[in-house]
C-alpha cells in the first residue's frame, strides 16, 4: 500500500496540463484506492460514456488521476457564453465550475470587444482520463477559456468545430503578441481573483506582461502560474468544494506574486541553459502505460458503474 501511494504521487506529479504540482497528504487519506481489480484502460471506458452518473455531485482524486460523480452540463449556449467543440462532449463539470464559468462570462461581456466567452474543454460526463488530449481535467474542476474574443454567440454546431482560437504568444512564449489586449488582462484578473480558483495556467510571457502592468492589489497574480503551451487558451483549476471528502487539492502556490519566477521562465526561453550531459550509467525510465481503472481512486469504480 505504501508503494502504491508513492507511485500515485510520482505519476501525478508528471501529468501534463497540470504542472506546478504539490499534493495534499491530508486529502489523500480520504481517497479509497482499494476495492477495484478492474484492469481495463480507464480512458477507453471513461472516454466513451455519454452521460453523467447518478448521485450527488462530487470530485474524487486529483486533476490527473480521478473522476467525478453527479456532473452537470454547461448549456451549449447561454447569454454570455458558448461551449466549443461539442463533438468532444467535454462540457461537463461540477456545479461550482459551471457557476464559475457563467459568472466569469458575465464579466467578460462587460469588456470592450467581448460578447462573453468561448469555453473549451472542461471534463467528460464522469471525468476520468480522456481518449485524446489532456492528462488533467479529470475531476470536473478544470476549464479551458479561449483567448479569442467572441464577437457573436450564435455559432452553429459546425462553426464550433471549425473555428479556432488565436495565439497570444511571441518568441516561443517569452512575450505577448499584438493580439494581447487590456481586456485579456482584465478577464484574467477577474478569473484569478475569484476565491473558488486555485490556479490558472498561462504562458510565461503573459504573466510577465501582467506583472508589469498590475497596479494596486497584486495578490491575484499569485494564482497565475507559468506553464508550457496555454497561449490559445488559459486553463482554470478550481479548489475542491469545502468539506468534500475524497477530492484532492494541490498545495497553494508559493507565497508572493510569482513574478520573479515567471521572469525566470522567460529568461530560460530566451537563453536556454545548455543540455545536461547524458549519464551513461543512468537506469532507463520505464515507459508508463495508460492508467487502468484499478489505478484510479476506488470510488471511480462506482462512478463508472452507476
Predicted regions and their residues:
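C-terminal motif of bacterial Sec signal peptides marking the signal peptidase cleavage site
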Residues: 14-16
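Catalytic cores and adjacent binding grooves of peptidoglycan-active enzymes
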Residues: 22-35, 39, 155-306
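Short, solvent-exposed beta-strand-terminating loops
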Residues: 59-60, 147-157
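Short, surface-exposed glycine/acidic/tryptophan-bearing loops
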Residues: 132-149
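Extended, low-complexity, intrinsically disordered C-terminal regulatory tails
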Residues: 45-48, 100-132, 201-223
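Bacterial N-terminal signal peptides that target proteins for export
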Residues: 1-6
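Active-site acidic/histidine clusters and adjacent loop/turn architecture
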Residues: 49, 54-120, 180-189, 194-197
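Extracytoplasmic
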Residues: 112-114, 138-142, 231-233
Amino acid at each position: 500500500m505504501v508503494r502504491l501511494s508513492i507511485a500515485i504521487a510520482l505519476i501525478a506529479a508528471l501529468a501534463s496540463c497540470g504542472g506546478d504540482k504539490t499534493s495534499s497528504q491530508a486529502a489523500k487519506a480520504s481517497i479509497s484506492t482499494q476495492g477495484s481489480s478492474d484492469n481495463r484502460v480507464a480512458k477507453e471506458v471513461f472516454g466513451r460514456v455519454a452521460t453523467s452518473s447518478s448521485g450527488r455531485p462530487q470530485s474524487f482524486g486529483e486533476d490527473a488521476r480521478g473522476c467525478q460523480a453527479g456532473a452537470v452540463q454547461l448549456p451549449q449556449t447561454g447569454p454570455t457564453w458558448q461551449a466549443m467543440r461539442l463533438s468532444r462532449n467535454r462540457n461537463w463539470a461540477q456545479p461550482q465550475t459551471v457557476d464559475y464559468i457563467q459568472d466569469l462570462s458575465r464579466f467578460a461581456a462587460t469588456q470592450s470587444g467581448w460578447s462573453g466567452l468561448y469555453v473549451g474543454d472542461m471534463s467528460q460526463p464522469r471525468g476520468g482520463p480522456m481518449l485524446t488530449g489532456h492528462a488533467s481535467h479529470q475531476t470536473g474542476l478544470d476549464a479551458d477559456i479561449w483567448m479569442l474574443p467572441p464577437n457573436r454567440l450564435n455559432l452553429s454546431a459546425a462553426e464550433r468545430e471549425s473555428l479556432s482560437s488565436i495565439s497570444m504568444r511571441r518568441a516561443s512564449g517569452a512575450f505577448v503578441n499584438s493580439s494581447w489586449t487590456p481586456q485579456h488582462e482584465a478577464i484574467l484578473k477577474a478569473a484569478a481573483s475569484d476565491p473558488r480558483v486555485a490556479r490558472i495556467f498561462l504562458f510565461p510571457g503573459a504573466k510577465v506582461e501582467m506583472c508589469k502592468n498590475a497596479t494596486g492589489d497584486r495578490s491575484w497574480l499569485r494564482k497565475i502560474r507559468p506553464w508550457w503551451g496555454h497561449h490559445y487558451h488559459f486553463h482554470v483549476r478550481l479548489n475542491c468544494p469545502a468539506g468534500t471528502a475524497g477530492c484532492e487539492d494541490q498545495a497553494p502556490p508559493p507565497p508572493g506574486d510569482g513574478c520573479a519566477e515567471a521572469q525566470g521562465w522567460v529568461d530560460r526561453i530566451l537563453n536556454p541553459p545548455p543540455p545536461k550531459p547524458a549519464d551513461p550509467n543512468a537506469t532507463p525510465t520505464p515507459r508508463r502505460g495508460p492508467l487502468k481503472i484499478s489505478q484510479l481512486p476506488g470510488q471511480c469504480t462506482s462512478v463508472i458503474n452507476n
